[in-house]
Regions:
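Flexible, compositionally biased loop and terminal segments
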Residues: 1-150, 163, 168, 173-253
Length: 253
């Protein structure tokens, strides 16, 4: 496995369980992320994507949203040296324009300083899978208008499909090339699709997370709240994945 994605759910319930304010749960969740990143590196996993803040989360109270943004800013400032030292590349996906200019600047600076890291931490922030697909479709369509149709002659040549193009269409229906081009328009361009998606807290849904990229991902659901996600639970998720036969839409021979 090279890419693990996590829906970090249960911070609020963890805080309530321990009679603490919700932001205390988010701080505990940040500590759990630190540990999980370390375990991923130990396991040889190259990419960790975490669902930190969705486009729907803006509907939460102003106090909680402000606290979450402050927590993220603190994470960026306090973890910079550690991420660089440990070879961790930091990357954010989502609607950056929704964030404050200050936070956008901090994110861009950390991405630049960690760009050579061999392990990649992807943080989904003000992110929604449907929104990402819509934005990608607009880019895809704009680029399509500026490039000739594949397999058709241009600039006065005969307007008939080439033999090679016709063969491609017969074998693949053009979907392989189209999918690759469309994928390059997504926020996750250059990042492999997740092999395993883990969701904590007992919820059995993906909540608008990586909808395009999750097409062939395996899923692991656990009742454990995110701040309580420990090495034992991490190992269970990895072990569950290792026992599965991934067909990727085809049949095993």
């Amino acid at each position: 496995m090279q890419h693990l994605a996590v829906i970090m759910d249960g911070n609020g319930r963890w805080a309530k369980k321990h009679h603490l304010p919700r932001l205390a749960g988010h701080r505990a969740g940040a500590e759990s992320l630190d540990r999980t990143m370390h375990w991923c590196k130990e396991a040889g996993i190259k990419y960790l994507t975490v669902y930190a803040f969705s486009t729907e989360n803006w509907k939460r109270s102003k106090g909680e949203v402000a606290g979450l943004m402050k927590l993220l800013s603190h994470f960026i400032k306090s973890k910079e040296k550690e991420l660089v030292k440990n070879g961790v590349r930091f990357r954010v996906i989502g609607r950056r324009e929704d964030l404050s200019e200050k936070l956008q600047g901090e994110i861009a600076a950390l991405e630049e300083k960690t760009k050579d890291g061999e392990f990649t931490l992807v943080v989904a922030l003000s992110y929604g899978g449907r929104d990402e697909i819509i934005r990608a479709a607009k880019i895809f369509n704009a680029e399509a208008r500026n490039r000739p149709l594949r397999g058709f002659a241009t600039r006065g040549e005969a307007n008939t499909p080439s033999e090679a193009s016709a063969e491609r269409r017969r074998e693949h229906g053009e979907s392989v090339e189209d999918e690759a081009v469309f994928s390059s328009c997504l926020d996750t361009a250059g990042i492999p699709d997740p092999d395993l998606i883990v969701r904590t807290s007992g919820e059995l849904r993906i909540s608008n997370f990586l909808l395009w990229q999750a097409a062939y991902a395996e899923f692991y659901f656990t009742d454990v709240l995110w701040p309580d996600f420990d090495k034992t639970e991490f190992d269970k998720a990895i072990a569950s994945f290792s026992k599965r036969e991934r067909r990727m839409g085809g049949r095993l021979k």
